[in-house]
């Protein structure tokens, strides 16, 4: 989910998943090549706009079984590929199709039969001048369109008129560079660990990544050990987010290095995986990410960076990270000493945003026939519907389906759904009609945190006492406060009490948290010092 506002933004750093462009890519120069257009007058046949995409002469190993995009933009200020996935007024026109294999010198045609968004067919595209670019997304280990090693074309300026036969040729001559680990500093370290558990699940090497911020004076006393603060960002936030936290002047850096600040090793998890953000719980589709985290990554970090174990670990997160921090605390109640969660994703699937997943028939349409909202502004005005958002994800996902989009609805489905016979997540609802699959909805119950607490209360309550600290804005742009009220009501009524702290912020939006970094660290210190 998006992180809009926060009283401690460096602590709970999120990312707009509605606009999937990595921030640093916005400043890349747009390369515009000469336009290659073939136009023919076809009086005896329907007009057809098409794009012929040529693979590179040397096709990279593994550059098969991917998603091919053609993106059309009115603006030359940014490469069209970097706008892919946007919703609202800034969304580009795009076409997409799956490609199983490329042959050198043999183009793949993208045209009227392929998935189109936001226009549902090419005839709806307004005629005029566009900047056009092709992108081939094939990276199997990082599910986002502009992932490292994916192929793309130079930008071409083209006049487009759906009423004429126009064939535009684009060549995939460019490649996004491989991902590099940022430079380490005195306080900043990075881990890239091959996971035996995940590699076995996927049948190929899969790596766990994390950014680490060391406490002040870490090098001065080699015998001192520190508790771990495990942080999870908003949807798809990468582990490299720590570079802006400690690498540049900021309120976080000032607090972190101040005298009297409780000393922790901060571990920022990576929000990227083969199906997008893995949510760090065990899943039929993502694999055993929860087990890999608790049995491989955290023990490795504690062993190599003088962590205190066992049990001296706390969690925090915003949005997606808010849900993950709560889920890890609930699913591993003895392993962690507390979770500080801001605006978590839905914690009760009776309020999956505004969908009651267990009772309603359709995700797109309410019982009264009104389109169901997905996003609002702080004044309550609806800015996006679920139908429109899922269509945007259908563009990104394989088989024209959101389940592998690497975005919000796709990643919830990848995490919470069973695995289909084709190896893909089973859709929670039909990607075109929105009709909810009742059997799949029943499977999702195992990740419904409120329901899980209810079903396992007797065993969980003694180990969760005083460990849940949650903040939720009452004007949350994605209606996540609705589910939080259901959890709050449950925890207030349930006995014995676990003394959970849930704070609601009137008028506060998505990303709000009630504590400063300094106050949060003080509460975390008290938690790890408990016997």
Language-model features: locations:
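Bacterial N-terminal signal peptides
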Residues: 20-35
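Contiguous beta-strand segments within globular domains
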Residues: 45-55, 61-68, 209
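Non-catalytic cap/lid and distal C-terminal segments of serine-dependent acyl enzymes
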Residues: 73-531
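Boundary at the C-terminal end of the N-terminal hydrophobic targeting segment
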Residues: 33, 40-44
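Short beta-strands and strand-coil junctions in structured, solvent-facing domains, enriched
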Residues: 58-60, 219-220
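Aromatic (phenylalanine/tyrosine) cluster motif
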Residues: 4, 12, 23-27
């Amino acid at each position: 989910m998006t992180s809009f506002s926060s009283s401690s933004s460096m602590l709970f750093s999120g990312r707009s998943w509605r606009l999937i462009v990595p921030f640093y890519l916005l400043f890349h120069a747009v390369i515009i090549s000469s336009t290659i257009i073939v136009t023919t007058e076809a009086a005896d046949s329907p007009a057809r706009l098409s794009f012929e995409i040529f693979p590179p002469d040397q096709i990279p190993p593994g550059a098969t079984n991917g998603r091919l995009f053609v993106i059309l933009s009115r603006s030359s200020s940014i490469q069209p590929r970097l706008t892919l996935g946007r919703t609202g007024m800034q969304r580009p026109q795009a076409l997409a199709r799956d490609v199983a294999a490329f042959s050198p010198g043999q183009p793949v045609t993208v045209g009227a039969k392929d998935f189109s968004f936001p226009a549902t067919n090419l005839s709806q595209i307004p005629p005029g001048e566009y900047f056009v670019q092709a992108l081939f997304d094939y990276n199997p280990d990082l599910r986002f369109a502009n992932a490292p090693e994916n192929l793309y074309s130079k930008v071409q300026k083209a006049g487009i008129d759906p009423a004429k036969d126009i064939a535009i040729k684009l060549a995939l001559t460019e490649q996004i560079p491989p991902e590099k680990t940022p430079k380490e500093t005195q306080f900043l370290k990075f881990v890239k660990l091959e996971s035996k558990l995940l590699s076995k699940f996927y049948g190929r090497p899969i790596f766990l990544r994390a950014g680490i911020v060391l406490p002040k004076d870490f090098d001065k006393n080699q015998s001192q050990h520190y508790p771990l603060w495990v942080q999870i960002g908003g949807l798809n936030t990468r582990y490299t987010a720590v570079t802006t936290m400690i690498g540049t002047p900021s309120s976080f850096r000032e607090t972190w290095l101040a005298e009297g600040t409780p000393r922790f090793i901060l571990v920022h998890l990576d929000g990227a995986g083969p199906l997008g953000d893995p949510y760090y719980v065990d899943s039929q589709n993502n694999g055993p990410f929860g087990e890999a985290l608790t049995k491989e990554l955290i023990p490795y970090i504690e062993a190599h960076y003088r962590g205190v174990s066992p049990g001296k670990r706390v969690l925090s997160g915003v949005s997606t990270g808010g849900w993950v921090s709560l889920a890890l605390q609930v699913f591993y109640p003895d392993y962690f000493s507390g979770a500080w969660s801001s605006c978590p994703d839905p914690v009760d699937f009776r309020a999956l945003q505004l969908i009651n997943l267990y009772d309603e028939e359709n995700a797109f349409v309410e019982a009264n026939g009104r389109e169901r909202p997905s996003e609002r502004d702080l004044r309550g005005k609806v800015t996006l519907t679920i139908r429109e958002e899922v269509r945007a994800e259908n563009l990104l996902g394989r088989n024209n389906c959101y389940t592998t989009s690497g975005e919000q609805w796709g990643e919830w489905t990848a995490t919470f759904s069973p695995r289909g016979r084709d190896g893909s997540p089973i859709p929670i609802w039909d990607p075109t009609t929105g009709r909810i699959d009742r059997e799949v909805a029943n499977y999702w119950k195992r990740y419904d945190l409120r329901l899980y607490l209810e079903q396992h209360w007797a065993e969980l309550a003694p180990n969760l006492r005083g460990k849940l600290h949650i903040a939720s804005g009452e004007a949350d742009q994605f209606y996540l406060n609705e589910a939080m009220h259901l959890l709050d009501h449950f925890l207030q009524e349930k006995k014995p009490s676990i003394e959970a702290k849930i704070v609601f912020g009137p008028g506060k939006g998505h990303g709000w948290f009630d504590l400063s970094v300094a106050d949060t660290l003080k509460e975390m210190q008290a938690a790890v010092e408990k016997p």
